[in-house]
A protein has these predicted regions:
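Active-site beta-alpha connecting loops in nucleotide-dependent enzymes
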Residues: 45-48, 315, 333-407, 455-457
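Residue-level signal for inorganic ion chemistry
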Residues: 38, 57, 92, 107, ...
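N-terminal leader/targeting and accessory segments in enzymes
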Residues: 1-91, 351-353, 379-380, 384-394
């Protein structure tokens, strides 16, 4: 974080004249990070309440503290009162971002946000100093933290925007003010909160609130909800598609090559290019098209963008291929929903191996559609060419039963991680491949931690 005058950073939070021009070099929510000249933002929590550390933060040199309410021992002239700590972070993030002028790409969508963010970063990073959202910092706390990493030398920023409820993307977009927006697709994540995919589409389109007149909005032309959506008149839609040559950017001759994909990219504004990406599945080709469209609509050269995509690196447990004991394990257990499960199984069906196995766990936050979604997953698994399916989790029990009913002979529902690992170890051998996928809360990496030592990783 570059130093910024306190009165500029706190504009809209503190009364006019409250803060002086003292330079602030850090905004933190962690009392252990407090240093002279910082602002400490107190968050109430289940285990710790940041308000309990406010007075100590001032003793250690904090210039100001942001509180939900007055705290004994904290002078009024040092306390910025904001009933909502998240709102305070967003205001300061927006104020800080307004002092710098990098080109910003905002990424949202039901599926593929993080991969598309990573691909966009890879596409852009070779053109200048670039920052991106790290980890899952895609909410009203994480986005300001990302913006605070912008510096004087930063030329580009790629920020991910997540949501659980309507209105959240709008607040994030107004804070980040992206130059280009991306909506990857409209799925069913958080449908329990929003009620329908139409409402999810409206929520994702809130990214337009942060886009200026004429700004490009990169959209999935293969998504029926986006295709029929009423787009705001101030944005310029840029459509991408797998196969539709009428789209602004499309992919033809899509094929798997080793652990990645190859395709012909057709850009109506720039011509045709042969592209390879180190990520499997047609869905990742779509993510690459979105990244390419965003980067080139910033004015970056297609050849450099394509070279960057070839160096893309997947993060965390997102379709990471691990070679263990002569077997390939595709770790894709960072998150899951019906759309990403379907895409993963489609990718896995084409995977070059002797036999294919899958360990699938619960998809969380599906509300009333959870039962039907897990049953449909079982039917999809039965049609995916698997040798055997192992499931874990209470909802995944429905997946196991549906897979059996659909004709998959070898199905095991594991009661714990050890049972899951044992079921796989008893069946798999060198030359086989395993797909591991579930929502983050299922922690399927714990089953892999029991699987790997035995199979020889």
């Amino acid at each position: 974080m570059e130093h910024i005058a306190a009165d500029l950073l706190l504009k809209g939070l503190a009364p006019e004249g409250f803060a002086d021009g003292q330079p602030i070099g850090l905004v933190t929510t962690d009392s252990r990070e407090v240093c002279p000249g910082c602002i400490f933002v107190a968050f109430p929590g289940e285990r710790f309440d940041g308000h309990d550390f406010a007075a100590k933060a001032l003793e250690e040199g904090a210039a100001y503290v942001v509180l939900n309410h007055p705290v004994e021992g904290v002078p009024a002239e040092k306390a910025v009162i904001s009933p909502d700590s998240y709102h305070a972070m967003m205001v300061m993030g927006a104020n800080y971002r307004s002092q710098f002028h990098p080109k910003v790409v905002g990424v949202t969508g039901s599926v593929g946000k993080t991969t598309t963010k990573q691909m966009t970063y890879a596409a852009i990073a070779g053109f200048g100093d670039t920052i991106k959202t790290e980890g899952n910092q895609n909410n009203e706390l994480g986005l300001p933290r990302t913006l605070f990493r912008i510096g004087k030398e930063t030329e580009y920023a790629v920020v991910e925007m997540g949501m659980s409820h309507a209105g959240e993307i709008e607040r994030l977009a107004r804070c980040a003010r992206p130059d280009v927006g991306i909506i990857t697709c409209i799925g069913v994540s958080h449908i329990g909160n929003l009620g329908s995919q139409e409402n999810i589409c409206k929520a994702k389109l809130e990214i337009c609130a942060g886009l200026a007149e004429g700004s490009p909005l990169v959209l999935n032309g293969d998504d029926p909800f986006l295709r029929k959506a009423a787009l705001p008149g101030h944005v310029r839609p840029v459509w991408f598609s797998l196969g539709d040559e009428s789209a602004d950017v499309c992919a033809l001759n899509v094929r798997q090559e080793g652990d990645g994909m190859a395709f012909t990219l057709c850009d109506r504004a720039a011509g045709r290019y042969e592209v390879t990406i180190p990520a499997m599945g047609r869905h990742n080709v779509a993510n690459a098209l979105a990244a390419y469209a965003a980067a080139t609509r910033l004015g970056l050269a297609p050849e450099g963008v394509i070279a960057g995509l070839a160096d893309f690196e997947q993060t965390g447990m997102r379709q990471k291929v691990v070679h263990a004991g002569g077997m390939d394990v595709i770790e894709d257990c960072y998150n899951a929903n019906p759309d990403s499960m379907k895409a993963a199984l489609a990718m896995f069906r084409e995977y070059p191996c002797k036999r294919c196995f899958a360990l699938l766990g619960d998809m969380l936050e599906l509300g009333e559609m959870s039962a039907s979604a897990h049953e449909e997953l079982g039917r999809q698994a039965a049609g995916a060419g698997l040798t055997a399916l192992v499931t874990y989790g209470p909802e995944a029990a429905r997946t196991a039963e549906a897979a059996k009913a659909a004709g998959l002979a070898d199905v095991v529902h594991a009661g714990d991680y050890q049972q899951a690992a044992d079921a796989l170890l008893a069946r798999m051998k060198a030359g086989d491949a395993l797909l591991v996928k579930a929502s983050r809360g299922m922690a399927l990496e714990k089953a892999l931690a029991l699987f790997y030592p035995v199979c020889g990783k």
